[in-house]
Amino acid sequence: MSAFLDKLSGSQCVSLEKCGDVVVSTNDCMIALYCHFCRDLFTQLPEFLRHLQGAHSDVLHFTKEHNVYSVEELMSGEQDDAQEDAHSAGHNSSSGDSRIPAKSEDSRAIDASEDNSDNSPVKSEQKGMQNEINLLAEVTNILLQSKEREHINNESKPENGGFNGPCKKASSESNSLRICDLKSHTIARTSRKRMSMLKNRILRVIDSDVSAKREMKPSEPNYILPITETIQEDNIPKICFETQPKPIPSSSNLSVRKSSLSEPNVSLACTNYAAKKTTLTIPKLLNCTPKSNLPCQQSQVYSDSNGRSETYHISKATSQGSKEMESFPVKITQIDVLPPLILPETSTTPNQKERVNALVENNTVNLYTAQNLPKEKPKKFFKKRGELWMKSEDSPSKSVKITKYRGNPIIVKRVQTSSAKSSPCKTQIRSNDKTKCFASEFNSTKIRKLKMENSIALKKEDPCSNKSIRLSKMATISSCEILKVVGLPAITDQKLEDTLLLDELETMRKKADQFSKIYKKYDSIWNYRKIFPPGKPEFISQKMFALTREVNETMGCNLANSAIKSIINQISVWHYNIYTKCIVLDTISETARHTLKLFSFLPVSFAYFCKCCDDIFTLNEDYTRHLVSQQARYQCTKCIKAFKYRGHFEKHLQNVHP
């Protein structure tokens, strides 16, 4: 390139002048042209050339005015190149497989050439070449259309010649159709078989249902079937009054032997009677001849054990107006064997039972209106609900006292003598319906439940209110004592310094000044939220240990790490409350102003440091929740370390303080 530029500069026709530099930005992948005259950047070459011609023509002395290509001219040149490429691609892609794409590319190239032919400043020779190209494109389109028609006609007519492709396809299609026909035939046959099987099953079920409905259920011994058919008069025999009347049954005939009514015999007799009545009387019901209303009727009971029958004669007596049954036939339908009675150990007389039942009924009826009665003082020993202790005839140690009030129901009171403690037997009677007996106590139990719920809710909020108050008082006392060591008791109790003497006040303020100077050095602790990124908990714990060591050495005290953390938390909370509550400085006491001046370097935002562990919290809610979870039951007196479990505390004593 340098040799080419030397040749151009060496000739007299060409004069080159350096107008700018090419600037490249690697981040944005952009190229720009830098103008030396006005120090501007241009992203496009035509803009840069127009700028030089318009703004710096006095320096450069352009000989020609229009020596810069316009955008339209550049686009027309690019379109001509595209047309030539498309035309060459169309000729190259004129094979049998790519007919349609070639056609589309040629048509697009022709359309583009026709559209841009008017605007492009091309010479006459180029126009002639374009006309020839257009003619060739039209001829190729006509040939392609004719070939497509022939191809469609050839596909519609099956060929028997040497072209094997379509024949194979046709044969494969026919084979596939035959296989499909076979499959459909087998599917239809199997489906017919399944449907016939289902049909047979359904018919069997229907037949079984019909036969089950036709079967008559066995009738009970007392059941009488209604006569549906009419009785013919010819079949009814005439009444013969010449027959001798049968004798009236005696009491011996009506009695039933106990031997014949044993449990297995009676059960068998009942079952046989029901079975025979259903099997024998049903088919003969329509053909039976009605008998006259004789004064006696017979009923037989069959038994399989001894094979003998017993007859029961029942007489009917007719009255003047209507016939009434004076005696009924003895029919045993069911015999149940009851379990043996379990009698209580204490014997009760019938008179005693009647008295007790009467008293219990009176108590259940009248306890509904007993709510307004004056309540007695509760005794030390209470009995269970629903228990009434009455006086028995055998044991004179117990007595019942019944008191009546005006317009009030009877109330049973229990009075026990001194000898009642020695008496071993007690009669205990419970009421059957406890809900009725103790309806008066329902409201009291409801109120008791509400009180219990309220107490449970209070326990959830504050599990031990008195204990928490005592602990809070102890915590304030301990925090005051810890703050006195540092000289800052005014944070918790502002009136405390008013009671001190001047010498004590001066010593306290000196201690506070010393502590503030030491604390100011550790900005990673008091400025935890402002530092970015914040320090790690391990680093801050190391700083906290260093702070405690320095405070103990300079101030001559023996404070633990947890005590220093509590002091820092109290100072930061006190400082935050003063600045957020918008307190006027004139209303604050002198001690508060003095402490504010000492800790003026503290920011408003702060962090909470846990006493038991190295966790740090920025929100008060999270800190309090963590404190509740970290409540310690055991604390070492030597190192003031807290432990939640006794085993951990004992291990600490064995390992650390042997």
From Swiss-Prot:
Its main location: nucleus. Residues 78-127, 151-175 are annotated as: Disordered. The keyword Transmembrane does not apply. Keywords: Cell cycle, Chromosome, Chromosome partition, Meiosis, Metal-binding, Nucleus, Repeat, Zinc, Zinc-finger. GO terms for cellular component: autosome; nucleus. Residues 100-111 have a biased composition (Basic and acidic residues). It comes from the Eukaryota. Residues 118-127 have a biased composition (Polar residues). GO terms for molecular function: zinc ion binding. One of its GO terms (biological process) is male meiosis chromosome separation. InterPro entries: Znf_C2H2_type (IPR013087). A zinc finger (C2H2-type) spans 33-56, 608-630, 634-657. It is found in: Nucleus; Chromosome. Belongs to the Teflon family. Specifically required in males for proper segregation of autosomal bivalents at meiosis I. Expression is required in the male germ line prior to spermatocyte stage S4. May have a role as a bridging molecule maintaining adhesion to hold autosome bivalents together via heterochromatic connections. Drosophilid specific gene duplication generates rgr and tef. Teflon has a function unique to Drosophilids. This is Protein teflon.
